[in-house]
Amino acid sequence: MLVAMSGGVDSSVAAGLLKDAGHDVEGATMKLWGGDSDSGCCSVSDVEDARRVAFQLGITHHVFNFTQEFNESVVSHYVASHQNGYVPNPCIECNRHLKFDVFLDRALRLGFDAIATGHYARVERSPEGSFILARAKDRLKDQSYVLSMLTNKALSKLVLPLGHLEKSEVRQIAKSLSLRTHAKPDSQDVCFIKSDIGRKGFLDGRISFTPGTLYDSKTNEKLGEVESLELLTLGQRKGISAGTSRLKTPTRRFVTHIDLDNRRATVGELEDLMVTTVKLGRITWCNQSLEPGSVVQVQLSAHGQPNSAVFYDSYIELEEPCRKPAPGQTCALYIGDIVVGSSTILAS
């Protein structure tokens, strides 16, 4: 079995648990980003941490250079999406194209039977024999959302040793194994964007920023100008105060709509952000499809709360209104704890 080792505590423990269980284990770290990183993954130091943990565990460690594939499938997609007014989740695209496509393919070609990762989710078998992706025991760390694009074919080759553990248990196991990563902080933010330059600094020079005008969502009154509509996000409050400070209202104001084509965005109150309909793109099914009219649970962001909804092929109707999800984010569909499928959000 080949363990994808990021250099963090989770994948370190995944490798340790599998080895202790008697599996023939090797580790591999993907070199994905050629630039600097300070997010806690994708850096030179992370590769070194993974190598040293593998040495501690007494397993072979490989390094796969997938920088070209990462740039083409994840970074370029991230840049192009922003240029077109979408806000993608690069971790989901990395899982889709790198970890569970390119990495899995490399592992199988090298003769491994399966791969394992340190994600917090569970892979189980249904009574019919198909593979099921389910939420982790640790609901605060559950990562089934970012794995919701996986097909049954990928699930059949995936082992997730941490799905039945709490994060605190994982750190304790790492400490008991004397792993150098036992106290290493979790990775944060987008791995290929340094915190000192942020999203604006990263996109500057990679896309053409579109200046735009802010309008009041109810009165259509012109409120001010923004340098880049691509850098606005739905629900944003910071950075729009200059245009909204003269409004005679004590309520908080949010970006409620962004229209790149007409170079405008609207600002309104929280109620103007709430929606009950979310338009979906093509659905990727995990192991079964849904009939229109099916009642499901949906999750619209990595840390979002589940919401009951009715599924209608190209859209969902939410039982309770929620904040508008940004186009380009992912809608994960659940029945109970089981992931049924997912789709890119087109509009809301």
State each model region's role.
Residues 1-148, 159, 168-169, 255:
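ATP-dependent adenylation/nucleotidyltransferase module used to activate substrates
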Residues 34, 116-348:
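AMP-forming adenylation/ATP pyrophosphatase catalytic core
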